[in-house]
């Protein structure tokens, strides 16, 4: 069977890519993921979630209450979701609940998005270290085209001059430097 080859950026922020070098993941990351999967695997897992913990062949692996509890907000999320459930990023599109989670390793990215009330799921896999941006675009286009849902627009926030001044400074990342002034 042919396999996709992962790609990473040659330089941070650059447009040139190179084949990602495979590296063994230490056992310490197993709890955080370390899962190798396919689109079919992800959609099978999505159906398991939608069916309340029951497998394709009718075997109950989790109580339905447990699956539903995983979808409940546990903590406010930073900038990647509205909140975080038990293993799930929680969002809302046009008032419709959206749960999802992504994963990444050297040169590969994956994202599973489920809309429980619509009995709908989409899985997107890419062989690029920058694939997560593409995932967002593909999921947004799919939900707009198939379910007629509009992507939530970022809401502006107001900060006092004091709060803005507290954020002023120079921030350094591997791909550049950002200078904020108040």
Please give the residue ranges for each predicted region.
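Catalytic loop of the DD-peptidase/beta-lactamase superfamily, centered on the K-T-G motif
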Residues: 10-182
């Amino acid at each position: 069977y042919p396999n996709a080859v992962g790609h990473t950026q040659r330089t941070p922020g650059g447009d040139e890519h190179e084949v990602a070098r495979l590296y063994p993941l230490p056992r310490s990351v197993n709890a955080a993921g370390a899962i190798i999967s396919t689109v079919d695997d992800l959609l099978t897992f999505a159906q398991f979630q939608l069916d309340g913990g029951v497998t394709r062949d009718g075997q109950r692996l989790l109580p339905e209450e447990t699956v539903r509890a995983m979808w409940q907000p546990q903590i406010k999320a930073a900038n990647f979701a509205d909140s975080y459930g038990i293993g799930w990023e929680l969002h809302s599109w046009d008032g419709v609940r959206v749960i999802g989670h992504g994963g990444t390793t050297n040169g590969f990215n994956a994202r599973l998005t489920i809309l429980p009330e619509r009995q709908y799921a989409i899985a997107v896999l890419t062989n690029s270290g920058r694939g997560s941006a593409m995932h967002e675009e593909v999921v947004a286009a799919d939900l707009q085209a198939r379910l007629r849902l509009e992507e939530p627009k970022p809401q502006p926030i107001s900060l006092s001059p004091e709060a803005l001044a507290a954020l002023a400074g120079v921030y350094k990342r591997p791909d550049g430097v950002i200078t904020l002034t108040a």
